[in-house]
Amino acid sequence: MAKNSNKVKKNTNKANNFKLLADNRYAKFQYAISETIEAGIELLGTEVKSIRNGKANLRDGYCSFRDGEILLLNVHISPHKNVGSFFNHDPLRNRKLLLHKKEIIKMKSNTEKKGMTIVPLSLYLKGSWIKLTIGVGKGKKLHDKRQDEKQKSIKKEINSALKR
């Protein structure tokens, strides 16, 4: 007979804990996202502190290929306020994304098509790791945006009519 048979096991899997730190809603409006992928990101200590405080802006960010790596460009992470200026980071520095070689090759082949680009979609905590969701998308034209707005309004009307 086991002594600990009446104890209930708690779910201690930290990988299931997600906390959204920054979201790029503008990219979802500007681009038709065809594929998404989760990537790690190489950060400095002060950048981690700033991101955990919600001081990251993904709106103008994009990804580029250099020397067989994917770099995250033009993402603003504010300097940490409690650190001296000597130890702080550059807010707009290029950050390396951590992906497998096969994923990098797949992303590169997808972006070689005309009009395709890689944009950051969201930044979140997965356990104790900061992860970035990037998407391959094609820029929407004005008529595509109008069509999406019409679809949203029609869907909203249908849902409100069904609730009555």
Curated annotation (Swiss-Prot):
GO BP term, pick one:
trans-translation
Q: Where is this region: Disordered?
A: 141-164
Which InterPro entries does the entry mention? Answer: SmpB, SsrA-bd_prot, SsrA-bd_prot_CS
Q: Give the record's keywords alphabetically.
A: Cytoplasm, RNA-binding
Recorded GO cellular component terms are: cytosol
Give the signal peptide as a residue range, or say none if absent: none
Where is this protein found? Answer: Cytoplasm
In Gene Ontology terms, what is one molecular function of this protein?
Answer: RNA binding
What are the Basic and acidic residues biased-composition ranges?
Answer: 145-158
Where would you say this protein principally sits, based on its record?
cytoplasm
Known role: Required for rescue of stalled ribosomes mediated by trans-translation. Binds to transfer-messenger RNA (tmRNA), required for stable association of tmRNA with ribosomes. tmRNA and SmpB together mimic tRNA shape, replacing the anticodon stem-loop with SmpB. tmRNA is encoded by the ssrA gene; the 2 termini fold to resemble tRNA(Ala) and it encodes a 'tag peptide', a short internal open reading frame. During trans-translation Ala-aminoacylated tmRNA acts like a tRNA, entering the A-site of stalled ribosomes, displacing the stalled mRNA.
UniProt family annotation: Belongs to the SmpB family.
HAMAP family registered for this protein in UniProt: SmpB
> What is this protein identified as?
SsrA-binding protein
Q: In which organism is this protein found?
A: Prochlorococcus marinus (strain AS9601)
